From Swiss-Prot:
Upper lineage: Viruses, Duplodnaviria, Heunggongvirae, Peploviricota, Herviviricetes
Subcellular location: Host membrane
Domain of life: Viruses
GO biological process: calcium-mediated signaling; cell chemotaxis; immune response; positive regulation of cytosolic calcium ion concentration; positive regulation of monocyte chemotaxis
PANTHER family in alphabetical order: C-C CHEMOKINE RECEPTOR TYPE 3 (PTHR10489:SF649), CELL ADHESION MOLECULE (PTHR10489)
Protein family according to the UniProt entry: Belongs to the G-protein coupled receptor 1 family.
Disulfide bonds listed in the record: C145-C222
Keywords, alphabetical: Disulfide bond, G-protein coupled receptor, Host membrane, Membrane, Receptor, Transducer, Transmembrane, Transmembrane helix
Name of the protein in question: G-protein coupled receptor E1
SUPFAM superfamilies linked to this entry: Family A G protein-coupled receptor-like (SSF81321)
Transmembrane segments: 13-35, 78-98, 109-129, 160-180, 190-210, 242-262, 279-299, 323-343, 351-371
Species this protein is from: Equine herpesvirus 2 (strain 86/87) (EHV-2)
Listed GO MF terms: C-C chemokine binding; C-C chemokine receptor activity
GO cellular component: host cell membrane; membrane
Gene giving rise to this polypeptide: E1
Amino acid sequence: MATTSATSTVNTSSLATTMTTNFTSLLTSVVTTIASLVPSTNSSEDYYDDLDDVDYEESAPCYKSDTTRLAAQVVPALYLLVFLFGLLGNILVVIIVIRYMKIKNLTNMLLLNLAISDLLFLLTLPFWMHYIGMYHDWTFGISLCKLLRGVCYMSLYSQVFCIILLTVDRYLAVVYAVTALRFRTVTCGIVTCVCTWFLAGLLSLPEFFFHGHQDDNGRVQCDPYYPEMSTNVWRRAHVAKVIMLSLILPLLIMAVCYYVIIRRLLRRPSKKKYKAIRLIFVIMVAYFVFWTPYNIVLLLSTFHATLLNLQCALSSNLDMALLITKTVAYTHCCINPVIYAFVGEKFRRHLYHFFHTYVAIYLCKYIPFLSGDGEGKEGPTRI
């Protein structure tokens, strides 16, 4: 009887332990399921800064150290390449436009301002390289953070406005060739460029104020910092403004302009007019190819709580997509000089003349064998 009682006690204890374990597993499963239905939230150490610093709705933490680590290891090297090639290319564009093409019409003025916009953006890249490489530890002070963020957005908006104005300029030149001559003068060009930069600066004013703050550990983070009571409202309004100005507005204007231009060229084919719009058309297409993916992913990242119900793993994938598309978008600032060299016939001719006149002479002076007329030069050998 004693043995039976002991066995019964052991079985009861084992059954209780099993039931407790199963109940704990079930409770854990339920909590996990409920948590997965709630939108995830970003860690304060996330990579995304400035344009793409997305703060998800209040929920259980969703840490994404893999994205942060990848950004710190890869992005600074890519930004360095973009900085070097972009700086060289856009400086060449500025020199050639001023030295050879002359600032005598609206088109050349806008091309010059487009290069200056790219240069302004490029000059901020070394700071972002350092910031990302240091895992978001800003060491240059809050004032410089605000200034550089504002300059970033101002260069983006001025670039968009310049491309829009180049499209409108081509539209006027093709559709209203004679009438447009009154508006495509140097004076109108100067007024247009001044208004462009003023409007870009005005639209960038919030970025000069709502960036840079010090966390509880004393670290300065150069990220968007909005009033606590309405952080999500400010952030969504900011992203909506960026997407409207950098994607929707230029897309609508350029679609209408090129629709009318193509209809006119189909009715009255003109090789000269075709050449006149080819360069600007390629510049426009390149802009959308590089910036559209980023804008779409940014939209999903910001409004995903309303549009989608993402689990942490899917949210991490979205952040990785944001990292990739942002890097591609930043690469655009070194693309325009390449387009000019391959598509712009006049630019290519002036570029060749510049290298032949200034670069080749110095290379031959300091590297004699490049000139092909050294002392040991021999005549052709006859067989």
